[in-house]
Amino acid sequence: MLHDAIAFWPAALQSAPGPLTLEWALLLALAALAGHLVQRFTGLPKILGYAVFGTAVGLAGFAGGAWPLHGVGLYLLELGIAVVLFEAGARLSLRWFRHNPMVLVQSLVEALLTFFAAYLLLRALELDVPVARALAVVSVAASPAVLMRVVSDLRASGPVTDRAIALATLNTLYALTAGTAMLRSIDRGDTTMLASLASSAAVLGVSLLVGALLAALLVGAFKLLHPTSQDTAIVILALIGACTAVTTPLGGSAPLATLLAGIVLKQLQPRPWVWPRQLGTAAAMLNVLMFVLVSLMAAQADWHGAITWAALALVAARMAAKLLSLLLTGPASGLSLRQSLWVGVALVPMSSVALLLTSQFVAASHS
């Protein structure tokens, strides 16, 4: 691999961040090229190219990703998720739920059915209760990053697209709230259901406070800056980066805080947003990093027989729960059965949020 190829570098450079930085810089450039070629020659979304490239690099033995994630790698993953969820939250209008409250009911039914289907399956496979609960929470999460990237690449629009993004955003909100609360309970050594509920309220409260502060700061900045200027993009990214750095130490979830910040911002300024072009470029690079990292980690996991079959069973149970819940609640929420089926399919992918929660659970179990 590239890591071996640069082993001849002088000792001074070996101790500097140069080699690892060079590896990741080249990986991101090649991943972007792979995504471009996939879309150009097949018409498929670029994320397929990112995922295939990341998988190939992982199988080739690239050693640039430590597990569980920590340090700069963990921060960059959280930052990438935070930027995506901020944009997803800014698309979500609470007025929609007042006009069609069944959308919120639909999201709750789908999340609960997915959680219990995954939990019961994992308990049937004789996994311990804490492990089954953690993996069931991870199963609830969808992937707004995948959806929004596919929507951007294919220029998709319509009721199915809007509903899928809304439900994926809400699923992520539930998963981050419950998952972060479980992590706090593990840290305190109290994993009872009552402790988890109290922790969920605390995590949601702290994240909402930080998110509201972020939204207020952005509203103030937007009064001084042109919405599509380069300076606006810098301010948005800098404040999201600061939010990502401080929320977890305060007891909240950084991605959850930015998601809530986007929702609050949408309520404060409900007009349609035109995001700065520079923000889209920065977010695209973070997206490439996330998809490569997720694929790389998945390729390097220890997929021996029992784990592989358990993972496949969990994926099947999760898919069945999501599709069934959408088909049951779709007509009452204004979707046809065909539209409900496609929304359910759109909620099946799992990506960076699942990787983040899994890494945090592994780190907590080892501490």
Predicted regions and their residues:
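Transmembrane helical cores of multi-pass secondary ion antiporters/exchangers
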Residues: 1-367
